């Protein structure tokens, strides 16, 4: 069985459609080459909230594709969202508040935790 994971990042922008669209595009346009060929993630949902000024994006794919798309989404959010200008009803900690990796098929929570640590290190570096 192929490994499939889900990522549900929360971005600190829920009002500016142009910024939201650019972040989602960065995620959706990401491709990775694996032993199975070129892969992309599938964006399942984009849920902006005006009052909270936050958007939740849901996407799935192989661990390699999800990790790269998550990195590219976080990178684009950090580039476009000015937290000094951010106001919303929901507490926030940065342009990307949370970036969870969730096992869907053929994988475990422990594997997702390892991938999350790898992704966090890449973002930090």
What label would you give each PLM region?
Residues 1-125:
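Long, contiguous binding/interaction regions
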């Amino acid at each position: 069985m192929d490994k499939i994971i889900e990522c549900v990042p929360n971005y600190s922008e829920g009002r500016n459609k142009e910024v939201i669209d650019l972040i989602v595009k960065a995620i959706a346009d990401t491709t990775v080459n694996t032993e199975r060929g070129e892969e992309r993630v599938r964006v399942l949902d984009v849920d902006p909230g005006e009052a909270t000024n936050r958007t939740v994006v849901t996407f799935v794919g192989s661990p390699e594709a999800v990790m790269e798309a998550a990195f590219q989404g976080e990178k684009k959010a950090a580039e476009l969202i000015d937290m000094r200008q951010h106001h919303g009803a929901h507490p926030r900690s940065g342009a990307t508040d949370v970036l969870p990796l969730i096992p869907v098929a053929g994988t475990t929570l422990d594997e997702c935790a390892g991938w999350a640590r790898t992704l966090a290190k890449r973002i930090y570096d």
